[in-house]
Amino acid sequence: MEHELTSEGKCVFCSQILPQATLTKHLATHLAKIEKEDASKSPETYCHIVVDDGVMFLHLLVKGKASMKKIDTFLKDIWLECCGHMSGFGHKDFKVSTTHLVMDVFETKVKIYHDYDYGSTTRVFLKGIKNYKLKLKEDVILLSRNEPLKLICAKCEKHPAANICTVCDWDFFCESCSGKHEQECDDFEDYAKMPVVNSPRMGVCGYTGGHIDTERDGVHQ
């Protein structure tokens, strides 16, 4: 189903909703303008980083002197945390510790990964886009996030999906068809019914949603 989906996100600066493919360039225009305005204000290094799992993505602006732990915590809060599992960053050629500074890891356009839960692992990828000199207060700023995906019920093929059955081919069901599926699948009401959420962790372990940007964490309207 993933290849049939299209992904788009809202720009934090102008609220324009754009396709995933053009969002990076669009955000760069805003960031370059802010960098020019902040040039005389003793700015600090901020890293524009894209986190993705296919059609799901986050655009982050992270203070260069912040530790990678800041990103780890943010990813858990918005996308991943369910049962207190362990997590960490990695790269095929070098180690990435949560104590490393963000600006040191993303000095170039490096691509690393982040794993959450070493049992039922959810892996996402992080890529450094560009560093900017900016005068900001926050350590991590959410520049954009994919809007809720248009997942459709597998049974009626009409209404937005609200739940997943984790034992029946991970099929999606709307609220109405979820009730019907309970009559067909004994495990659905017991443990296999999981909510549709805007996260790569959807349907895994006990994940039911994040704690940041919750208005974009549900079913598409």
Where are these regions (language model features)?
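Short linear regulatory motifs enriched in tryptophan with gly/pro/ser
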Residues: 1-221
